[in-house]
Structures are given as C-alpha cells and as structure tokens.
C-alpha cells in the first residue's frame, strides 16, 4: 500500500505539488485579507478608547492646577474648556464608525463603486493592460534570477569571458525591456487612478447637485467638512488605492506561483517539498500575525472623521473671521482648534502604537523567520549530498552548476518571501480601502435617500400637487418642519398673477417655512384631518427656459470665482446668456447696463474698468514694455468690465449685494417673486424704486417686510399669529396704516397711564385696609373699657355731661369725665359683645393678611 502510494506520488509529484501551492496560496490570501478582525483586536481598540476617555476625564479634574509644566497645562486647559465637546466628539466618532461599518454590510446590494468601475470600458482596458504588463515583468524577473545565478557561478569559477558575455550580451539587453515595462506599469497605474477619480467624482457630483432638494437635504443632514472630504479626499484616496490594488495583489500571486513552479523544476530533488513546507510555515506565522493585527478599517474611518472635524474648525475661522474678530473670540477659537488637534493627536498616538507593535512582529517574521527558512531550504542540497563524486563532476557541467542553482533558488525564495510580505502589507491597504469605501457608500446612500426631481416636488402621496404658471394656491396645506413641529395645522390662500401678497407675523410663526415649501426645500405634507384634502397649485421652476418663480433671501448669494456678468445672470450660464442674445455680447451687456441704471449700480461698471486699467498698467510696468505695446485706456471695453472676476462677497457691501440680487430678478423677469426681507440694508428711497420697478416688470410680489412704507405695494395680506392661526384676505394699506397709527397711539397712552392707575389703585387699597384696621381697633378699645371690672363696681352712673362729677364707691368725688353714652342694658351689652367678637376676628384676619403682605 505504501509502495503504491509512493509510486503514485512519484508519478504525479509535479501536479500534486503545483495544486498544493495554489491551494496554500489561496488559503494564505484569504487568511491575510479577511475583512473581519478578531475579537481580541476589537477588544483592545475598545479598551484603548476607554483609556483615552479616562485620560480626558483626568484632565478635567486636574485642569485647575497652575503649577504644572506648560505642555501639560495646555492640554488640560483644552480638555477642561471643552469637556462637553470631548464627550460628544468621542461618541460621534464611535457611533459614526459603527454606523459606517453597518452601512457597508449591504447584503444583496451591489457596491456602486465596483459596479461603476466594471461598466467603464476605459477602466477595464487599463486593468487588463496592467495585468498583462505584470505578467511580463514577472517572467522577466525569473529570467533575471537565472542570469544572476549564472553570473555568480562564472565569478566563482573565474570565467571572466563568460561573465562578460552574460553581463553584456544577456543581462544588460534584458534591462531594456524590463525598464520599459516598469515605467509603463507606473504610467498605467497613475492613468488608472485619474480615470477612477474622474468617474467616481462625476457620478457623485452629478447626483449631489442633480436638483435643489437633494443638495439642500444632504447639506442639512451632513456637516460641510464631511461632504467636502467625501467629494475630494476620500475619492482621491480610493482612486489611488484602487489603482495600486491590482499591482499589489496580482504581482505577489504571480511571483509566488511562478517562483514555486520554477523551484519545483530545480535540479535539487527536495526543493519542491521544501517549498511546500515553507508555505505551511508562512501560513502558520501569518495566522499568528492576525492575532495582533489592528482593525485598520476602523482606524481609517475614525482618523478621517477627526481630520474632518479639525479642518471644519479652520474653515469656520476663515468664513467667520469678521464676526470672531469683533467679538474678540480668538482665544475661544484657539481653544477649540487646539482641543480638536489634541483629540487627533491622542488618536494618532494610539494608532502609531498599535501599528508599531504590528510592524515589529511583521518585519521579524517576514525578513528573518521566512528568510532563515529559505536559507535552510537552499542549504539542504549542499550539506546533505549523497554522491559527492557525481556532484563534483556536475560542477564542471554548465547545465548542472550547484552554485548557480543556489543563487537562483535563493533569489527565487527571496522574491517569494517578499511577495508574501506584500500580501501582509496588502491586508492593511485593503482594510484602509474598505474604510474609505464604506464612507463613500454611506455618502451615496445618503444621496439616494434624498434624491428628488426638479419637476416633482417632494410631497406626501395623499397631497395633490398641480402646476399653474399664473397661480399659487394653498388648500389645507400644513406647515410642518422636518423635525415634525407643527407651525400651522392647515393653511389656505389663493394668489393669482398680478396680485401682491404681504406676509407678516412674529418670529417662528411659519413665514420662512412657507417659502421653503414653495421652493421645494421641505416636503409637502398632507393635513392630518381626514375630512380635508390637501392641494397645492404652484408654478413650475422654469417655463420655456424662463424663470416662473424667483427667490430673494435677506443675504444674497455671491459667487467669488465668477464674473460680473455671471453674477447678474445667475443661475444662468454664459451659454444660456449667449443663446438668449444670439451670441451678441454687446446687446446683452446693453440690457444689463439698463438694469443696473434702475438700481444706481452703473458705477460698478466704471469701477471694474478702473480696476482693469490699473491691472494692465501695473502689468506693463512690471514687464517693462515699450510705449507702442502699452494698451491705451480706450482698449478697455464694456465687455471687459462685465468679464472681470472679483471677491464679490467681501468687496461689496450688503446693500449693494441686495441691489445686485434685485438686478438678477429684473434680468429673469419671473411671474412671481418671493422677497424675504431682501431690502433690509437698502435706503428707503431706493427700496421704493425697487418695488415699483418690479411691479412695472409685471412681477407678482410675495413679500416679508417690516417697514410700513412698503405696504402700499400689496393688495393681499397673510397674517400669522404665532399660535397656529392666520388671517388671509384683501388688504387696504391706507386703512391698515390708519388703524396701525391709532393702535400705536392707544398703546402709547396705555403705556403712560396704566402705571399711574395701578399706583393709585394700590394706594387706595392700602388706605382702605388701614382705615378698616383703625376703626376696628377703636371699637375694640371702647368695648374693653365697658367690660373693665373697676367700672362695673361703680354705684351709680350719671348723664354724660362734660363737667359732671361722679361719686366713687368710697364716697369721694372725682373729676373723671364719663364717656358720651349711657349705661347699656344687658341685652344690648350681649349684642355689642357678639358684634365686637366678630369684629375682633376680622381685625385679626386683616392683621395677618397685612403681615403676609
């Protein structure tokens, strides 16, 4: 049985070993690049996160100590000042990592990135070309290894003629195609990265800016820094790593397979089995390395989030520099930036420690353990020779040179070892690529969840939406925020083209919410009342390439990298401008100048021409041109003034920006215009002209304005009370203003008189209470005198005359005057007693109330 198996093995030895090599390679590849990290590594990551939070808590407690060194003091100050942000930041990063990880586990759904790349012909051609070039380079590497063995063999035997022949005739000639192939591989790799970047960027940007609803919803759901990183840094990292992935994956596989096959056909009989044993050692050591492997996917995602947070703070500093400078908030902002950097440094320190331990173990195993095993394998034929005489004879034969075989095998084993080492490095790169892929998938899922259509407004299925270019009608439409806060349960009004609507109400009543629903930024909800039907009639965004409804916010948008012409025609492009005026710039610019003259903005054209003249003059002076080559001032045309690019948002005041935004509306001539306090920074005289010109252009105005001087431009009023109610109806500006003046006068009188009335009422109340208490005390004193026992023992009472004397019980006369009333009877005395008791209770009650006051 054993002999039969041995015979079978000897017969099929090559095929069995080759199959074993491939199976072992696939097992090693799967073990190295498995996506899930072990539980021990995750536990270590969680423990390190807890330790990091403990450090922050310790920093909070010890931040008061002023005697520590400067560096620790800065860290503790940062932590103490931002303790809340610390906890929030840690929670956000951890939750985001888990969310992204779960978001990547989209079972049954094809990854959009892979689908996108596989459907691109250029990417496929580049990948195939790269694979062919890698195969050619591997074959050239095998040939170079053989030539290295022959060169060393000729040197050992001192065959200088053969050495020169092999060096110049084979080795140098082989270097020409090898150099060309290496350069071509580098070129195709970079070209592939650019192609992937372009493809993914076009896909995500087209989806992100496909319509206003998607752009607004995603920008509200995600932070600006995250979106910027997803569209720039993440795409760049993904494209670079994806282009290198084939090189990192295919070349080691080809090297391992071809090198092992080459070793199998070596003159040494045990080299095939030794290579298999070496492969088993590699598999076992790779399994051990996996135990200390950090979770590179999680590290990549957390690092990207922290870097985005740090960059967002710097972006906020740049965008809000004036506000921060006026409030003297640079110290607080410095603490914010320092703290975010402190969080990033803490995380990077932990990441570096984890990577350092893993790199030490990897370097020792790859370079020394596998290298020693390869040396042992190569030395077996030399130290265990069965027939030394035959081997000595073989040294003389060029085809069976042991030195050449040793060098060749050693070179092949080194190549195979380095290839396996690249597999281990590939594990890290794949996990990092997976982290970036999860972030991009999360962003793509967010875009899919908020996708919309310019022609279809986001709405509830129970709500009916119709389009009429000459009418805006709300019928039982609730005003509900995205946070499900009900501002108005049901809103109904009807506005036809030619009428003008004024909207007033307190802050937070629903004015801006109405505009957001009308602009398609918020979804249209159905009324919760089942007995009512919600219906919205509104004009489309564009009608025959003309704008049907236009929005002017309080702070207009100004593009800083656009020309003066593009500022006025925004959101139209230059191509649409040329199409509108049949490629006649002079005609179009003349219309723009007429619009600017209506708003007293024609001086901007002169200012732009002056700037162009100054730029050309300074350019000519710097280049020291001759007088004939200098451009004269007349060479600057009006077209050039409209083509200048400036930092419009910073160089123009808010008032000029609002007038320029009004010029946009005049240019587009919409049927309806929503004006949300868009003239708050404009002079009253200019404001009157702006509204008057808008009505002359046939634009129906829907205005939110607090200046009563603009009320006469409207004939309908929509008033919100801030409690969910509203009033809609015709509007008489004169009557309303008259009533408003009377109301203001009445309020002024009330403001002046009511405090006086309240003060008088308070004084009267106090006087009344004091009088009651005084009378009660007087009656009580009189009653106490009547009930005095000395008085009751008197023998006789006389009439109450002022000078009358009475006789005391001792018979002596006294000059004491009697009170001016007679002796009461017993029944009258009892009645008086009862009355005084009740009065006494009332007096006590009043006293207690007075004390409480």
Curated annotation (Swiss-Prot):
<feature type="transmembrane region" description="Helical">
    <location>
        <begin position="364"/>
        <end position="384"/>
    </location>
</feature>
<feature type="glycosylation site" description="N-linked (GlcNAc...) asparagine">
    <location>
        <position position="33"/>
    </location>
</feature>
<dbReference type="GO" id="GO:0005524">
    <property type="term" value="F:ATP binding"/>
</dbReference>
<dbReference type="InterPro" id="IPR036640">
    <property type="entry name" value="ABC1_TM_sf"/>
</dbReference>
<dbReference type="GO" id="GO:0005778">
    <property type="term" value="C:peroxisomal membrane"/>
</dbReference>
<feature type="domain" description="ABC transmembrane type-1">
    <location>
        <begin position="127"/>
        <end position="417"/>
    </location>
</feature>
<dbReference type="GO" id="GO:0007031">
    <property type="term" value="P:peroxisome organization"/>
</dbReference>
<keyword id="KW-0067">ATP-binding</keyword>
<dbReference type="InterPro" id="IPR011527">
    <property type="entry name" value="ABC1_TM_dom"/>
</dbReference>
<dbReference type="GO" id="GO:1902001">
    <property type="term" value="P:fatty acid transmembrane transport"/>
</dbReference>
<dbReference type="GO" id="GO:0015916">
    <property type="term" value="P:fatty-acyl-CoA transport"/>
</dbReference>
<dbReference type="Pfam" id="PF06472">
    <property type="entry name" value="ABC_membrane_2"/>
</dbReference>
<dbReference type="GO" id="GO:0005324">
    <property type="term" value="F:long-chain fatty acid transmembrane transporter activity"/>
</dbReference>
<dbReference type="GO" id="GO:0042626">
    <property type="term" value="F:ATPase-coupled transmembrane transporter activity"/>
</dbReference>
<dbReference type="GO" id="GO:0140359">
    <property type="term" value="F:ABC-type transporter activity"/>
</dbReference>
<feature type="transmembrane region" description="Helical">
    <location>
        <begin position="122"/>
        <end position="142"/>
    </location>
</feature>
<dbReference type="InterPro" id="IPR027417">
    <property type="entry name" value="P-loop_NTPase"/>
</dbReference>
<feature type="glycosylation site" description="N-linked (GlcNAc...) asparagine">
    <location>
        <position position="608"/>
    </location>
</feature>
<feature type="region of interest" description="Disordered">
    <location>
        <begin position="33"/>
        <end position="80"/>
    </location>
</feature>
<dbReference type="InterPro" id="IPR005283">
    <property type="entry name" value="FA_transporter"/>
</dbReference>
<keyword id="KW-1133">Transmembrane helix</keyword>
<comment type="function">
    <text>Involved in the import of activated long-chain fatty acids from the cytosol to the peroxisomal matrix.</text>
</comment>
<feature type="glycosylation site" description="N-linked (GlcNAc...) asparagine">
    <location>
        <position position="295"/>
    </location>
</feature>
<feature type="glycosylation site" description="N-linked (GlcNAc...) asparagine">
    <location>
        <position position="162"/>
    </location>
</feature>
<dbReference type="GO" id="GO:0015910">
    <property type="term" value="P:long-chain fatty acid import into peroxisome"/>
</dbReference>
<comment type="similarity">
    <text>Belongs to the ABC transporter superfamily. ABCD family. Peroxisomal fatty acyl CoA transporter (TC 3.A.1.203) subfamily.</text>
</comment>
<dbReference type="InterPro" id="IPR003593">
    <property type="entry name" value="AAA+_ATPase"/>
</dbReference>
<feature type="glycosylation site" description="N-linked (GlcNAc...) asparagine">
    <location>
        <position position="560"/>
    </location>
</feature>
<dbReference type="GO" id="GO:0043190">
    <property type="term" value="C:ATP-binding cassette (ABC) transporter complex"/>
</dbReference>
<feature type="region of interest" description="Disordered">
    <location>
        <begin position="794"/>
        <end position="853"/>
    </location>
</feature>
<feature type="domain" description="ABC transporter">
    <location>
        <begin position="472"/>
        <end position="747"/>
    </location>
</feature>
<feature type="compositionally biased region" description="Polar residues">
    <location>
        <begin position="794"/>
        <end position="813"/>
    </location>
</feature>
<feature type="glycosylation site" description="N-linked (GlcNAc...) asparagine">
    <location>
        <position position="39"/>
    </location>
</feature>
<dbReference type="GO" id="GO:0042758">
    <property type="term" value="P:long-chain fatty acid catabolic process"/>
</dbReference>
<feature type="glycosylation site" description="N-linked (GlcNAc...) asparagine">
    <location>
        <position position="241"/>
    </location>
</feature>
<feature type="compositionally biased region" description="Low complexity">
    <location>
        <begin position="820"/>
        <end position="838"/>
    </location>
</feature>
<feature type="glycosylation site" description="N-linked (GlcNAc...) asparagine">
    <location>
        <position position="647"/>
    </location>
</feature>
<feature type="transmembrane region" description="Helical">
    <location>
        <begin position="166"/>
        <end position="186"/>
    </location>
</feature>
<feature type="compositionally biased region" description="Basic and acidic residues">
    <location>
        <begin position="40"/>
        <end position="65"/>
    </location>
</feature>
<keyword id="KW-0325">Glycoprotein</keyword>
<dbReference type="GO" id="GO:0005777">
    <property type="term" value="C:peroxisome"/>
</dbReference>
<keyword id="KW-0812">Transmembrane</keyword>
């Amino acid at each position: 049985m054993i002999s039969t198996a041995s015979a079978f093995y000897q017969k099929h030895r090559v095929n069995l070993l080759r199959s074993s090599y491939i199976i072992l390679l696939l097992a090693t590849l799967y073990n190295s690049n498995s996506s899930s990290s072990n539980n021990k590594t995750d536990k270590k990551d969680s423990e390190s996160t807890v330790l990091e939070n403990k450090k922050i808590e310790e920093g909070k407690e010890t931040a008061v100590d002023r005697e520590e060194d400067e560096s620790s003091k800065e860290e503790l100050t940062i932590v103490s000042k931002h303790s809340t942000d610390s906890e929030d930041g840690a929670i956000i990063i951890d939750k985001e990592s888990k969310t992204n990880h779960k978001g990547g586990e989209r079972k049954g759904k094809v990854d959009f990135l892979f689908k996108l790349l596989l459907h691109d012909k250029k990417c496929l051609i580049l990948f195939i070309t790269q694979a062919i070039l890698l195969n050619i380079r591997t074959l050239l590497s095998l040939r170079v290894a053989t030539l290295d063995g022959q060169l060393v063999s000729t040197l050992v035997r001192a065959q200088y003629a053969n050495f020169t022949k092999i060096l110049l005739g084979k080795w140098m000639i082989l270097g020409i195609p090898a150099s060309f192939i290496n350069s071509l591989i580098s070129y195709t790799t970079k070209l592939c990265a650019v192609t992937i970047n372009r493809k993914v960027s076009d896909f995500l940007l087209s989806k992100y800016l496909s319509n206003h609803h998607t752009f607004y919803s995603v920008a509200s759901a995600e932070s600006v820094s995250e979106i910027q990183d997803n569209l720039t840094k993440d795409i760049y990292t993904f494209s670079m790593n994806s282009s290198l992935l084939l090189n990192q994956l295919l070349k080691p596989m080809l090297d391992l397979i071809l090198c092992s096959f080459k070793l199998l056909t070596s003159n040494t009989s045990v080299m095939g089995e030794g290579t298999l044993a070496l492969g088993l050692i590699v598999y076992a050591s790779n399994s051990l390395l996996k135990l200390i492997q950090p979770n590179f996917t999680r590290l990549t995602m957390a690092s990207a989030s922290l870097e985005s947070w740090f960059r967002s703070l710097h972006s906020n500093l740049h965008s809000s520099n004036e506000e921060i400078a006026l409030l003297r908030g640079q110290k607080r902002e410095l603490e914010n930036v320092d703290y975010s950097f402190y969080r990033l440094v803490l995380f990077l320190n932990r990441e570096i420690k984890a990577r350092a331990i893993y790199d030490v173990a990897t370097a020792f195993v790859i370079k020394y353990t596998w290298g020693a095993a390869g040396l042992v394998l190569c030395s077996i034929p030399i130290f265990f020779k069965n027939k030394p005489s035959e081997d000595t004879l073989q040294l003389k034969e060029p085809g069976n040179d042991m030195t050449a075989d040793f060098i060749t095998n050693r070179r092949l084993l080194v190549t195979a070892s380095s290839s396996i080492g690249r597999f281990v490095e590939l594990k890290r790169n794949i996990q990092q690529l997976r982290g970036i892929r999860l972030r991009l998938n999360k962003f793509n899922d967010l875009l899919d969840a908020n996708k919309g259509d310019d022609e279809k407004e986001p709405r509830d299925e129970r709500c009916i939406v119709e389009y009429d270019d000459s009418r805006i009608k709300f019928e039982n439409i609730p005003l509900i925020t995205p946070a499900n806060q009900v501002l108005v349960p049901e809103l109904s009004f009807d506005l036809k083209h030619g009428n003008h609507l004024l909207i007033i109400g307190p802050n937070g009543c629903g004015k801006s919410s109405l505009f957001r629903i009308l602009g398609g930024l918020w979804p249209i909800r159905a009324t919760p009342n089942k007995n009512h039907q919600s219906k919205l009639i509104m004009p489309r965004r564009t009608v025959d390439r003309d704008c049907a409804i236009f929005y002017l916010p309080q702070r207009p948008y100004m593009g800083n990298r656009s020309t003066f012409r593009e500022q006025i025609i925004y959101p139209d492009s230059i191509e649409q401008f040329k199409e509108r005026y049949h490629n006649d710039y002079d005609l179009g610019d003349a219309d723009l100048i007429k619009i600017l003259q209506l708003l007293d903005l024609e001086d901007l054209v002169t200012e732009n021409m002056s700037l162009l003249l100054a730029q050309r003059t300074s350019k000519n002076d710097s280049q020291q041109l001759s007088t004939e080559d200098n451009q004269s001032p007349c060479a600057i045309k009006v077209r050039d003034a409209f083509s200048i690019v400036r930092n419009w948002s910073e160089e123009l005041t808010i008032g000029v920006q609002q007038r320029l935004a009004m010029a946009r509306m005049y240019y587009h001539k919409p049927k309806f215009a929503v004006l949300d306090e868009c003239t708050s920074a404009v002079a009253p005289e200019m404001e009157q002209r702006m509204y008057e010109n808008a009505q002359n252009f046939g634009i129906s105005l829907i205005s939110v304005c607090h200046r009563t001087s603009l009320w006469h431009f409207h004939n309908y009023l929509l008033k919100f009370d801030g409690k969910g109610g509203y009033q809609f109806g015709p509007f008489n500006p004169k009557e309303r203003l008259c009533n408003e003046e009377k109301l203001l006068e009445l309020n002024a009188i009330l403001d002046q008189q009511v405090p006086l009335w309240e003060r008088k009422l308070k004084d009267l109340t106090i006087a009344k209470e004091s009088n009651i208490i005084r009378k009660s005390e007087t009656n009580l004193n009189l009653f106490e005198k009547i009930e005095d026992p000395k008085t009751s023992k008197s023998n006789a009472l006389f009439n109450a005359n002022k000078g009358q004397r009475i006789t005391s019980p001792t018979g002596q006369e006294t000059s004491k005057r009697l009170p001016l009333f007679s002796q009461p009877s017993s029944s009258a005395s009892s009645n008086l007693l009862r009355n005084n008791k009740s009065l006494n209770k009332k007096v006590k009650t009043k006293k207690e109330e007075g004390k409480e006051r």
